């Protein structure tokens, strides 16, 4: 019977055990959750969890630091809530799992904010002081947002990469990798952003489409006799012509110093209206069509035969400054997918070009590098001096046309590198930088950094497993790491370098420690204000302070050193058990942390890596302002509750994209209500139950109660297995099924009659309540990691003397004898009950009965089903929720069926069963015999249900 109907009956005469609970049906989450956040903080719940966990094995989830800039968005919410679920579930599994949140504080975005607010001419000391203040303000804002989501952690003592101790330890980490021999200085093309005025890390580069001019350019013959010999000809049939390159970067032509051919590709000498052209043989037809020329192949030769031939610069006739020749070098990276099969080489602006030219004997001083840090050519560059390279593109094309070197020019849309902060195009630009060498062997010998890092990946568990190959291929193919940046707000590469040679001071390691001590006292400002004479005396005449700062990925990438073993070493430990971030961090934090730990420790800094996907809308589209499909976690928390966000995240397979929309949130809210209603039923029916006073020993429970506890214990074993593997969506799916079907649709449905109509203190009712007590103990704990607000709210009603559900560990259910057989038997009974329910529904549709209690059923069953049904005796009717039930034996499954008949008896006013003995006691004409017994005598005897 439903509570509603029971409540509508006059209760005074024949009361039933309908109880209430202070746990309301409506969650009213937006109003209640902030009160819990406040209470958790005021009562020091995180500290109480730490005290309760002390001495247990440690489990360290190390927080990848978000950047201290801007409001938190849905991606932040996904990340922090997943971490919170992991930490809470590990604490409840019997670990000491602290959570120390952190923030990444140095770097370009904050420097840009300070420039926007105060201009670009601030003294360095003021930039630093304002950057610190800005980062602190942003952290406090984000902290409030994270706490509102129900994330528990050491919010009073987070780590910040700008804290003095962290800055100092980062300098010490730099000293470690220098000592081991991984760091070198060199000229090399690096990702360069003109707006940043600095080198960029690989992780700071994003790709988007850009339209540029694409050009085919001829470099005229400089050595016609040698060229003829290379093609096996006595002489060239005509003097005009040359070799043809294709490029999408016209601005690099002024800096050309070589041409690259593949040694094995066959090149053709083609006679055309524009002279003799050298093009890869397999590209001749396409190129002739593109150039609108007709051509005849005169001779062919493999690339190896053309090595070291020289050709005139294509602007040689336009200005004397370009009167130089370009040699042919061989390179395996040349392809014939597009273009001409010939690559022009400007070593200052391409990694492969640079490596090729250096390997052919070119020195750093030989390299032509006319592009300045702001994207303009040096003033002295012939024809184009002072122009920005992007403005120069069309002018270079016109100059080539005027010089007679241009064969074709058209617009070309291609995927091109952009700065992730400024969204502007970047280039490779050769600059003098500090690098960590991927293929460097440490001074002590052993494996290279690349080899060590790849071994570290092999030793790491990945969730999901595909992350391993992704990170492996990135490390296997990455270039040396550019450690240096040309900024102010960052940890300094606190070296003294020789003014003439650029060499490090011989006491560099000792000096780094001296600087670290000063930074520990007063921050990186100590380096800015340091007079070199304080540390190196008269050597200051020969050595100067290095002005570079460390890549911010080195800041966060060394948190395993300056947090796990530095600022928070008392709480944390190395290596961490888990790093958990979005899939972009294979290029970012996972990557830089692996490299720094491989250099410092010769191993990965983590035992496991968990990767989650990004949020998309209901149609699978990325969230963007232009589409207007973004969802703000603050808005959802204030409208529906943070619990709904938590349940959405936990119920979604985070290994792929996480789809969210109003429709999805509506479904999640409905699922939440089902769980909440289950908890309300449990708490209401336990409100007059005191475990110490009323609990029934397990061997005296009714059979269905033993089944329910055995089933719940088995389910919990499955759930804990999922929690251990960080599989949260199966936990949610199974718990929702458990609440709606196993409990709501079966066990609690069957239990209502016993709970409401049995004598309040009868063994039958107390057996049910004892089982419900154990179920509630178990359920609240497995819900707590993701439904944290609701589990805590229910726990305070259930166990008011306890501080919090979060200091508990997963519940140890009482042992039920023969649990496996019992679960198997009741699976059969539930199967039969499903058939009975279907038959009752058909009878109701045909207007033969009203409620199921108006029915009497005969179940025709065979084999194990017959045995299971008959074992329940007269209690079978309670399981089927009918007023009477009988079992008829048949030979086999084919003859099994259910007969439904309407009862011919009166309905009991109290229990609503239709029974022959209604009115058997004249003074209670509307009461059945069992209700009379339950109210006025010793109560009915029930053994199974």
Swiss-Prot record:
* UniProt keyword Transmembrane helix present: no
Q: Which CDD domains match?
A: Anticodon_Ia_Ile_BEm, IleRS_core
Name the residues that bind Zn(2+). 908, 911, 928, 931
Substrates-to-products reaction catalysed: tRNA(Ile) + L-isoleucine + ATP = L-isoleucyl-tRNA(Ile) + AMP + diphosphate
Q: Does the keyword Signal apply?
A: no
Q: Which GO terms describe its molecular function?
A: aminoacyl-tRNA deacylase activity; ATP binding; isoleucine-tRNA ligase activity; tRNA binding; zinc ion binding
Q: Where is this motif: 'HIGH' region?
A: 66-76
Q: Which PROSITE patterns match?
A: AA_TRNA_LIGASE_I (PS00178)
Locate the motif 'KMSKS' region.
622-626
| Keywords recorded for this protein, A-Z | Aminoacyl-tRNA synthetase, ATP-binding, Cytoplasm, Ligase, Metal-binding, Nucleotide-binding, Protein biosynthesis, Zinc
Q: Which Gene3D superfamilies match?
A: 1.10.730.20, HUPs, Valyl/Leucyl/Isoleucyl-tRNA synthetase, editing domain
Q: What is the annotated localization of this protein?
A: Cytoplasm
Q: Function, please?
A: Catalyzes the attachment of isoleucine to tRNA(Ile). As IleRS can inadvertently accommodate and process structurally similar amino acids such as valine, to avoid such errors it has two additional distinct tRNA(Ile)-dependent editing activities. One activity is designated as 'pretransfer' editing and involves the hydrolysis of activated Val-AMP. The other activity is designated 'posttransfer' editing and involves deacylation of mischarged Val-tRNA(Ile).
What family is this protein classified in?
Belongs to the class-I aminoacyl-tRNA synthetase family. IleS type 1 subfamily.
Q: What is this protein called?
A: Isoleucine--tRNA ligase
Q: Which organism is it from?
A: Burkholderia vietnamiensis (strain G4 / LMG 22486)
